[in-house]
Amino acid sequence: MKEGLPDLREIPSCIGGDPKSRRGIVVAKSIPAKKYGVTTGEPVSMALRKCPELICVPGDFALFETCSRAFKKICASYAPVMESFSIDEVFLDMSGTEKIYPDPVKLAHEIKDRIREELGFTVNIGIGTNKLLAKMASDFEKPDKVHTLFPAEIPTKMWPLPVRDLLFLGKASEQKLIKAGIKTIGEMARYPETEIQRLLGEKTGHQLYEYANGRDDSPVRGEREEAKGYSAETTTEEDIVTYEQAFSLLLAQCDVVAARMRKDGKKCSCVSVTYRMLDFRTRSHQKKLGNPTDVTEEIFVQVKNLLYECWQCQPLRLIGVALTDLTSDDFRQMSLFENTENHEKQKKVDGVVDDIRKRFGNGMIVRGSTMKTADKVARKAKAQMELRDKNS
């Protein structure tokens, strides 16, 4: 809320796109806008047809990041383990704090009220015995609410909801379920799992069937686990909507992180890709490698394959790569199917590039396909390294 402007939370409003050209998509919407049928992810032009008086303002990503850090700092002060789920969502694992905080509902109200009083915005808090139930509970009635969703409450609170409200269930899956006569989460939970898998695929069907029954054994992963490696990510001014755009950034990032890793004499056995969509949901996809590597080209090939597997060109504003499971071992398991000649050739290329950059600077040699992105990626990576060195 800015001085002289109405409170966007109390009027039909949305964040996203250019209000003058009416281009772009809705990143977030107010509760009054939701009553007009405005939905996150739809074109601004469509939202304006639903609600002609809709106030549309461009996103201030610097402000969002500042608010996010402040919000997460407060949350982290209460929990031994915190996992970021998106720019404005976290999971808190309160295991072992029962003597300090015996009443989880009372604690949730304390956290919620503190965020409102200190930061000026409201949050919903969901309480459950696993991440799924806590997330589902947080999406109940808004704003500024605390909700519980314990196993005994699933039949009354979760099962009556439409299947589209189930976490990670997309529009395509919703249409398949409705066509099969499955309209609520409860109907899905009572349906034979084999039939759900037949409709949605074996892996996806199993996961969503488990979710429909309130089961989720994924742990809350602390932020420290993510620091044992090399990573780079880039927030863009324009939406990333094609593989060509994404690969240009990812190749520049692979160049930077692989060079840092080689400088430290390390190799990685795991490569992951992370991206953030316009609704601020973040997704990650990773792959374990058969052999540890520090070769830029080999890493980039895996990154490309990962992105093909997990991304269908939804608009993005942030994308990144991470190299983990590090080793200093030079041993490499030989394979009959491996092109060892190409591996050695690429290692030599990386060595020459590293040497030139060390002697003359990073800007002296740049891949042609990354000329528009390499400088920005390198500058941000350097700033991240300096900040890490300062804090270590």
Tell me the role of every PLM-derived stretch.
Residues P19-R22, L278-R281, L326-D329:
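Short, charged/polar surface micro-motifs in flexible loops or helix N-caps
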Residues D165, S173-L316, R388:
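DNA-contacting surface of Y-family translesion DNA polymerases
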Residues D294, K304-K358:
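C-terminal hydrophobic structural anchor segments
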Residues V90-G96, S284-K287, Q333-N339:
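Short, hydrophobic beta-strand segments
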Residues T129-L132, A212-N213, K267-L278, L316-T327, ...:
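A glycine-rich phosphate-binding loop feature that marks nucleotide/adenosyl-phosphate handling sites
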